[in-house]
Swiss-Prot record:
Reactions it catalyzes: Hydrolysis of terminal non-reducing beta-D-galactose residues in beta-D-galactosides
GO molecular function: beta-galactosidase activity; carbohydrate binding
Subunit note: Heterooctamer of 4 alpha and 4 beta subunits.
Organism the protein comes from: Escherichia coli (strain K12)
Keyword Methyltransferase listed: no
Protein name: Evolved beta-galactosidase subunit alpha
Cell cycle as UniProt keyword: no
Gene: ebgA
Keywords of this entry: Glycosidase, Hydrolase
Length: 1030
């Protein structure tokens, strides 16, 4: 049996795991924490010799000792598939080869890496270590023709001692990497299958006597006033005889020395332990809200006082305890507002640079996120340093997932197999040792979706033996038999509420929810209401942070994103990897903006708006609101009536306080109170004045007495009637109706074509990812996407300066015997207004939800300048609207289109009182609904958006698709999660609604002023059901 198919052989010659740290020559240098400034740090990233092989045996024997001059090159770190070698494949949970534990395909893609590194004289007499922070999957190391060792565990640091193999001057380093190994069976995460040296490789030099490892711990007194810092240090002496040393240690608070002492006459023989502890009075406490860090600096000196090395460590005073079924951080109740984060770069795959990692964390902080789960494996060691600095609570997950066994009905197959215990336990042990000194880590997670069994229990006990200061999580320990937190994923709101009503003895979180695939997630507010209602639910992590699309460019220069199947890979899980709050290029999506608002730590509530009385609620757990300002603005239909700023003071953590706003005298217009809360100070992640949250409160409805629309340019209408059509002509317009469809086919205004495609009542939308289950289970089988419309009756009435066109149609799918009997009533007035009343009566049996009840038409493509009075500025839906407010907004059709990498319904604006689409000269169309509607406009047809699988497959139309929807199904998160809640569902049932279409010209009054008139002259009250008369 070879080494990569033997579960009892997890490594050879790999050093024991230990904390991640570096040695420096001075205290000043050490406190920079810049590893590249260390004289005994040598980065090996960059260009390497490389050759790709389909089989391990194809690698030539001379590879380990001879530089292959005719080979190509590859950048390290990189996934070799991203550099044009081998094949990418995306699966969510399935293994890409037959399950035959512990065996993997004999045709095992293999990368052979070589590079020369040069050691200066300064490395003589030193221990020389080589460290690999990430290699996928199995790799062997050779130096100067000598075998060093091998390792498994793709996302864990592997360290080897190569002191005996290196020399001053040039050295040949060779690494053979195989994509598949027995360890693949526990690395089946939801991501692209790829391989290579994808994190940094570097050399570390050590004096023969040095600090080998250390563990820092902080403990508070009962009053959480003073704290004890303790440190267990392991020192190593590689010399033949014992060495006497001094270990000095100093704790810095900025430039101030908090404590300084030493352990003198410390004799070191091989591995020797030492410890120190001291009290720190009233230390600043570390939390995600206030990530205050001290510097602990340890200096090791020889018997003559010469500095051997200086080792720094950032220290945060933080603890976590469980009490009364809740966990407490620094004796404070905390709720974790989190995300699940994979490593992914849209150009490099999992070879993620630290600039991108840092931007991720900055974006999280900007959007009120306070926790991150490293789904589902350890990150680059520097990730945790950044979390310490920026302030994020980390659930640090172990590199264990065997999800693929679920496909054969045995997800616990190896998790409950004692033969695999070493594999499982070793991974959590290596993980904890490496990252144990980070205050940001509050939870160790044993892995993900691997069933449950003896190996999980063994992992838990190993974790607790190493570190009893943190909580341990594993979601599939469903009864919380051993873990410290009970956890579920994708639990729906009603059951989540039930969990809150009947608390478990242990704290509860939901480690994955609100699947953020495509347009969504919806329903965040309803979830958050449950979380806030029940203290026992202390954490929630949206799935997931970032799309995993791979950027590509077509022949026309259009950027698009590849997903499963785009590389000819099969089986695959298609576009299931496009499920992030941010896009693959790190652009925030609408879902992230909604999440930011829903979890905002400063809440504003109305008490008595007539008196300007509000309430501010501080949902920070450690921090007052002294660094926040409230900005109030009273707006009336686009005009600011008053503004006010209030510096928030003396609002303690997790408390509330009254607020008083001075309201102006309001006129007849509809008015709102808009509140924005900003953070005053500049931070690492934001500028001063960074907005935290936005709220809107209605102050009054429009009470103006309606004035009928009566322009002075109206002329009598003429009606031209023939066998196929009828045309209504007025002062500056002509509208032609087809007698075959009952619809207008042409609308000319001042010589311009306004209408480009026949209008129609519409019950379908381009499928969004979160509606895929409804589409595949209901809509497609019932042919909703190909419903036909047939004219049953067409009538024309002319009287009193108006023409009525009445069309009665049936809209129904082929094959079935259900549908909607629809009535279109068009009132064309001499003044140019077109009043439209739409209604439908269902027949047959279809008791199910549908995407929408709406109306769509094609209009002149030049009318791309948009103004609307409704909810904005971003897209919004019934269950995803907290981040947007009602006002008058101006945009363009292009800007309102949310270009999802997998095209789908998008760009909706709710609660629209009126909208105008015009060209650059102000000519166009005004829409004034009888009651607020949903509105969207695209430069693409509905059919094209629905059929396209990638954004570059969208074919821009010459015209604009205008959608005026009565009801629109909420988003939900049912791509893998919760269905749309009952409140936001749309049913195939009787309906009635209406609106006015009015051509506008640049020289006429503005759309806003026109929209204030009353249209229809009693038409709507006669032709719409009572529900639409309000």
């Amino acid at each position: 049996m070879n080494r990569w198919e033997n579960i009892q052989l997890t490594h050879e010659n790999r050093l024991a795991p230990r904390a991640y740290f570096f040695s420096y020559d001075s205290v000043a240098q050490a406190r920079t924490f810049a590893r590249e400034t260390s004289s005994l740090f040598l980065p090996l990233s960059g260009q390497w010799n490389f050759h790709f092989f389909d089989h391990p045996l194809q690698v030539p024997e001379a590879f380990t000792s001879e530089l292959m001059a005719d080979w190509g090159h590859i950048t390290v770190p990189a996934m070799w598939q991203m550099e044009g070698h081998g094949k990418l494949q995306y699966t969510d949970e399935g293994f890409p080869f037959p399950i035959d534990v512990p065996f993997v395909p004999s045709d095992n893609p293999t990368g052979a890496y070589q590079r020369i590194f040069t050691l200066s004289d300064g490395w003589q007499g030193k221990q020389t270590l080589i460290k690999f922070d990430g290699v996928e999957t199995y790799f062997e190391v050779y130096v100067n023709g000598q075998y060093v060792g091998f390792s498994k565990g793709s996302r864990l640091t592997a360290e080897f001692d190569i002191s005996a193999m290196v020399k001053t001057g040039d050295n040949l380093l060779c690494v053979r990497v195989m994509q598949w190994a027995d360890s693949t069976y526990v690395e089946d995460q939801d991501m692209w299958w790829s391989a290579g040296i994808f994190r940094d490789v570097y050399l570390v030099g050590k004096h023969l006597t040095h600090i080998n490892d250390f563990t820092v711990r902080t403990d508070f007194d009962e009053a959480y006033c003073d704290a004890t810092l303790s440190c267990e240090v392991v020192l190593e002496n590689l010399a033949a005889s014992p060495v006497v040393t001094t270990l000095e240690y100093t704790l810095f608070d900025g430039e101030r020395v908090v404590h300084s002492s030493a352990i003198d006459h410390l004799a070191i023989e091989k591995l020797t332990s030492a410890s120190f502890a001291f009290t720190v009075e009233q230390p600043q406490q570390w939390s995600a809200e206030s990530p205050y860090l001290y510097h602990l600096v340890m200096t090791l000196k020889d018997a003559n006082g010469n500095v051997l090395e200086v080792v720094p460590q950032r220290v945060g005073f933080r603890d976590i305890k469980v009490r009364d079924g809740l966990f407490w951080i620094n004796n404070r109740y905390v709720m974790l507002h989190g995300v699940n984060r994979h490593d992914n770069d849209h150009r490099k795959g999992r070879a993620v640079g630290m600039d991108r990692v840092e931007k991720d964390l900055q974006l999280m902080k900007q959007h009120n996120i306070n926790s991150v789960r490293t789904a589902h494996y350890p990150n680059d060691p520097r990730f945790y340093e950044l979390c310490d600095i920026y302030g994020l609570f980390v659930m640090a997950e172990t590199d264990v997932e065997s999800h693929g066994f679920a496909n054969v009905g045995d997800i616990s197959r190896i998790t409950d197999d004692p033969q695999w215990e070493k594999v499982y336990v070793e991974r959590i042990v290596r993980h904890i040792h490496a990252q144990k000194n980070h205050p940001s880590i509050i939870i160790w997670s044993l892995g993900n979706e691997s069933g449950y069994g003896c190996n999980i229990r063994a992992m838990y006990h190993a974790a607790k033996a190493l570190d009893d200061t943190r909580l341990v999580h594993y979601e599939e320990d469903r009864d919380a038999e051993v873990v410290d937190i009970i956890s579920t994923m994708y639990t729906r709101v009603p059951l989540m509420n039930e969990f809150g009503e009947y608390p478990h003895p242990k704290p509860r979180i939901i480690c994955e929810y609100a699947h953020a695939m495509g347009n969504g997630p919806g329903g965040l507010t309803e979830y958050q209401n449950v979380f806030y209602k029940h203290d026992c639910i202390q954490g929630h992590y949206v799935w997931e942070w970032c799309d995993h699309g791979i950027q590509a460019q077509d022949d026309h220069g259009n950027v698009w994103y590849k997903f499963g199947g785009d590389y000819g890979d099969y089986p695959n899980n298609y576009n299931f990897c496009l499920d992030g709050l941010i896009y693959s290029d790190q652009t925030p999506g609408p879902g992230l903006k909604e999440y930011k608002q829903v979890i905002a730590p400063v809440k504003i509530h109305a008490r008595d708006l007539t008196r300007g009385e509000l309430k501010v609620e501080n949902k920070l757990w450690f921090t007052t609101l002294d660094d926040y300002t409230l900005h109030a603005e009273v707006r009336a239909e686009g005009e600011t009536l008053a503004t006010q700023q209030i510096k928030l003071r003396d609002v303690a953590p997790n408390s509330e306080a009254p607020l008083q706003i001075t309201l102006p005298q309001l006129d007849a217009r509809e008015a709102f109170l808009n509140i924005t809360v900003t953070k005053d100070s500049r931070t690492r992640y934001s500028e001063a004045g960074h907005p935290i949250a936005t709220y809107q409160f209605p102050l009054k409805e429009n009470t103006a007495q309606p004035v009928p629309f009566a322009p002075n340019n109206a002329r009598p209408l003429t009606l031209e009637d023939d066998r196929l059509s009828c045309t209504v002509r007025g002062y500056n317009f002509a509208i032609t109706f087809s007698k075959m469809s009952g619809k207008p086919t042409s609308w000319q205004v001042n010589g311009e074509s306004l209408l480009t495609r026949e209008p129609k009542i519409n019950f379908f939308k381009p499928m969004i990812d979160n509606h895929k289950q409804e589409y595949e289970g209901l809509w497609q089988p019932n042919h909703l996407q190909i419903m036909q419309e047939h004219l049953r009756d067409f009538a024309v009435e002319q009287s009193d300066g108006e023409v009525l066109i009445i069309s009665r149609t049936v809209i129904a799918p082929p094959v079935f015997d259900f549908g909607m009997r629809c009535t279109y009533i068009w009132r064309i007035a001499a003044d140019g207004q077109v009043n439209v009343a739409l209604s439908g009566e269902r027949y047959g049996d279809y008791p199910h939800i549908i995407p929408c009840i709406g109306f769509t038409m094609g209009i002149n493509g030049e009318y791309d300048q948009v103004a609307y009075y409704g909810r904005g500025p971003g897209e919004n839906y019934a269950d995803s609207q907290q981040a947007n407010i009602i006002d008058i907004w101006r945009s363009t059709v292009d800007a309102m289109f949310e270009n999802y990498p997998f095209p789908q319904n998008n760009g909706n604006r709710q609660h629209v009182r009126w909208t105008a689409l015009t060209n650059r000269h102000g000519n166009g169309l005004l829409v004034v609904p009888q009651r607020p509607i949903n509105f969207s406009a695209w430069h693409y047809t509905q059919e094209n958006i629905h059929a396209a699988q990638h954004c570059n497959e969208l074919q821009r139309s010459d015209d604009i698709t205008l959608n005026l929807d009565h009801q629109l199904l909420g988003l939900g998160s049912n791509s893998w999660g919760s269905e749309v809640l009952d409140s936001w569902r749309v049913w195939f049932r009787d309906f009635s609604y209406g609106f006015t279409l009015l051509p506008v010209s640049g020289g006429e009054a503005t759309a806003q002023s026109l929209a204030s008139y009353e249209f229809g002259a009693g038409f709507f009250s006669t032709n719409l059901h009572s529900e639409n008369k309000q």
